Amino acid sequence: MMAEDIIVKGKDVTVSFINKIGNRKEKKTVLEGLDFDVQRGEILGLAGESGSGKSTLAKAILGMVPLERGSIESKAENPQMIFQDPYSSLNPAKTISWIMQEPLKLGKKKYTGSERLAKVEEMLGEVGLDAGYMQRKPGELSGGQRQRICIGTALMQAPELLIADEPVSALDVTIQAQVLELMREIHRKKKLTILFISHDLRTMYNFCDRVMILQKGRIVECGKPEDIYSDPKEPYTRLLLESAGIV
């Protein structure tokens, strides 16, 4: 693999937090000694049980949590994150137009008000919604519509890396499929790199180019889903697959 094919590279990535228990302080290591890479243009799935460190790794890539040890090198311009809960991710007091314009106001490039509105309308079309949604507020939308708004808002600054943290787990099954298809289409059109965090290994099989398995803050397996699912090397991976009814 050529160096230019790697958009994010982690070496010995270690993250710890200090917990206070009464008068006592206790260090908890959440990620320990991770070596990994994210290839440009791929969809990399990050799987593991709750508490395995998936969300912490995503935040570390974005520089949202400090590293105790190691390094993360990122070549991604304007990386963005989509969160699990579309209900709490959007300001309920603001219109969709206001919400989606905010990233443009914060970016380096300056836009006029009419240019921002045009970009919002264009992005709404890309996520399968029309201009009629611009003056609505989040409380007027369904969960699937809200998540489409979250995706569109994340795309407003043309990110090279999109981190999706359990983006469909709060949605009904039929809506999950629609949102995943939207993300797949956006990935194809925009040649995005996506880090897809989920506990749903079934979804990852058809959606991801590679899957990385985390257990207690360590990477235990990484590879193409068809290889990992047909011949898991680690007992923990097999346990996850059995729990999902895959093996």
Show the residue positions of the predicted features:
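The feature captures the beta-strand-to-loop junction immediately N-terminal to the Walker
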Residues: 47-49
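Conserved ABC ATPase "signature" region
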Residues: 114-132, 241-242
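Conserved ABC ATPase signature
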Residues: 137-141, 145
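A short, proline-enriched helix->beta-strand linker immediately N-terminal to the Walker B motif
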Residues: 156-160
